[in-house]
Curated annotation (Swiss-Prot):
Cellular-component GO terms for this entry: cytoplasm
Keyword Amino-acid biosynthesis annotated: yes
Protein name: [LysW]-aminoadipate semialdehyde transaminase
Family affiliation: Belongs to the class-III pyridoxal-phosphate-dependent aminotransferase family. LysJ subfamily.
Enzyme Commission number(s): 2.6.1.118
Length: 395
């Protein structure tokens, strides 16, 4: 195994910063390994990871079953287009659909969340023959041109106008606005069961149930974006289970591959059949390597029932955060281990202090919200340390 000196690591950090496109604001540290809910930088500092790869690491960093599955598959076959069937693709389809409602029985595999949403939008237009989409204010579906079109945040959208049209944005959790927006021209309504980038805002049961009823009445499709909420994050396998509904298309990614890039649009058979042959495609989507990772990730999730851990630890964690006696806190909200701490001021300085002073990694969800997306394998003692770190920086 190659051994690197600290000088080597620093040179690589400098290379990333200087040769990168510059789109991202880089932290001043180099993460070199991870295990479970911990990561380590090049200088040996240990961090509690509540970023979790933006929700990728539900099963923990370096999950041994995913690692072993990837090793085995890499030795056998890594790439093969979807026109040529492979055993692992069939295994993934069978494994994924087995944990979903029977209505969701057709899979279009991709590499990422934004690709899953792009596919969903195209399938919706193909199925309905309509053009219009309805999305929510503060909603986030991705940054490629189609998914960006149903992402609300103006700073993401405005530099790239014109986008896919027409799209109508409504206030999240506003049933009356939803009724007014969905009409006979609407192809689909696309919603997150919990808005992530928009501030960790859960949907009300009334809103999502109304979305299901209204789309059915108007002949439109309901797309649920569970890129971040899927794979146990909210205390159920999938967040839609909290609401007693089934969408027409479910989009998944992030934790689906256990750390390997993998996404999917899962849909009803009649929706899948509406897309003409060759109407959509992907070179790497459904590759055997990602399929093997996905199978291992789902099987690990099912055996360990990690969603039950999220259902137990999430409310406890939120109550501990609510008990912090700080006038800077406006609200604590979330679902399972998808938690947002909203402040009355900018969140960025406090996130930086959590990292530098307490070795806790967290992320923003809008200007004033600290978002926590720890691996679902995190120990309660680590969450207690996170609470104490938050208490210290907000003192």
């Amino acid at each position: 195994m190659e051994t690197r000196t600290l000088e080597d690591w620093r040179a690589l950090l400098e290379a990333e910063k200087t040769l990168d496109s510059g789109v991202y604001n880089k932290h001043d540290l180099l993460i070199v390994r991870g295990q479970g809910a911990r990561v380590w930088d090049a200088e040996g500092n240990e961090y509690i990871d509540c970023v979790g790869g933006y929700g990728v690491a539900n099963l923990g960093h370096g999950n041994p079953e995913v690692v072993e599955a990837v090793k085995r598959q890499a030795e056998t076959l890594m790439a093969m287009p979807q026109t040529l069937p492979t055993p692992m693709r069939g295994e993934f389809y069978r494994t994924l659909t087995a944990i979903l409602p029977p209505e969701l029985n057709r899979v279009f595999p991709v590499n990422s969340g934004t690709e899953a949403n792009e596919a969903a939008l195209k399938f919706a237009r193909a199925h309905t023959g309509r053009k219009k989409f309805v999305a929510a204010m503060r909603g986030f579906s991705g940054r490629t041109m189609g998914s960006l079109s149903v992402t609300w945040e103006p700073k993401y959208r405005e530099p790239f106008l014109p986008l896919v049209e027409p799209v109508e944005f409504i206030p999240y959790n506003d049933v009356e606005a939803l009724k007014r927006a969905v009409d006979e021209e609407t192809a689909a309504v696309i919603l997150e069961p919990v808005q992530g980038e928009g501030g960790v805002r859960p949907a009300t049961p009334e809103f999502l149930r109304a979305a299901r009823e209204i789309t059915q009445e108007k002949g439109a499709l309901l797309i649920l974006d569970e890129i971040q909420t899927g794979m146990g994050r909210t205390g159920k396998r999938f967040a839609f289970e909290h609401f007693g509904i089934v969408p027409d298309i479910l989009t998944l990614a992030k934790a689906l591959g256990g750390g390997v890039p993998l996404g999917a649009a899962v849909m009803r058979e009649e929706v899948a059949r509406s897309m003409p042959k060759g109407g959509h495609g992907t070179t790497f989507g459904g590759n055997p390597l990602a399929m093997a990772a996905g199978v291992a990730a789902i099987r690990y999730l099912e055996r360990t029932r990690l969603w039950e851990r999220a259902a137990e630890l999430g409310p406890w964690f939120m109550e501990k955060l609510r008990a912090i006696p700080s006038p800077k806190i406006r609200e604590v909200r979330g679902m399972g281990l998808m938690v947002g701490l909203e402040l009355k001021e900018k969140a960025a300085p406090y996130i930086a202090r959590l990292e530098k002073e307490h070795r806790v990694l967290a992320l923003q969800a809008g200007p004033t919200v600290i978002r926590f997306l720890p691996p679902l394998v995190i120990e309660k003692e680590d969450l207690e340390r996170v609470v104490e770190a938050v208490r210290a920086v907000l003192a």
